[in-house]
Amino acid sequence: MDIIRRIEQTMMREDVPPVEVGDTVRVKWRFTERDRSGEDKSRVQAYEGIVIAKKGTGISESIVVRKISSGVGVEKTFPLHSPNLVDLEVVTRGKVRRAKLYYLREKKHLVVKKKSRF
């Protein structure tokens, strides 16, 4: 068991800022696509939204980010220690009273009472 922990420690990223539920974050994620000629192309896409859930610990830690795009709610799960994660920036800090903000799925516009914390 000690071997697994040591391997996980070498794979974990240290440049990931602390993120809590209720924070508004901007995630830059690298996608690799294959074009018609068969070449692999990678591009970076930014995704900004509210963190509605935080799951796991250690190397398996991930966050669920929700945003409204063209009137439709979109949620994406991002592993925090993935090599495809280019940048994670906390835009605003929020203080909420729940561990999971799944009730935002029922709201049309991300109307949530958030206190900003410093």
Swiss-Prot record:
GO terms for cellular component: cytosolic large ribosomal subunit. It comes from the Bacteria. GO terms for molecular function: structural constituent of ribosome. Keywords: Ribonucleoprotein, Ribosomal protein. Transmembrane segments: none annotated. PROSITE patterns: RIBOSOMAL_L19. InterPro entries: Ribosomal_bL19, Ribosomal_bL19_CS, Ribosomal_bL19_sf, Translation_prot_SH3-like_sf. The keyword Ribosomal protein applies. One of its GO terms (biological process) is translation. The keyword Ribosomal protein applies. This protein is located at the 30S-50S ribosomal subunit interface and may play a role in the structure and function of the aminoacyl-tRNA binding site. NCBIfam families: rplS_bact (TIGR01024). Belongs to the bacterial ribosomal protein bL19 family. This is Large ribosomal subunit protein bL19. It comes from Coprothermobacter proteolyticus (strain ATCC 35245 / DSM 5265 / OCM 4 / BT). The lineage of its organism: Bacteria, Pseudomonadati, Coprothermobacterota, Coprothermobacteria, Coprothermobacterales. The gene is rplS.
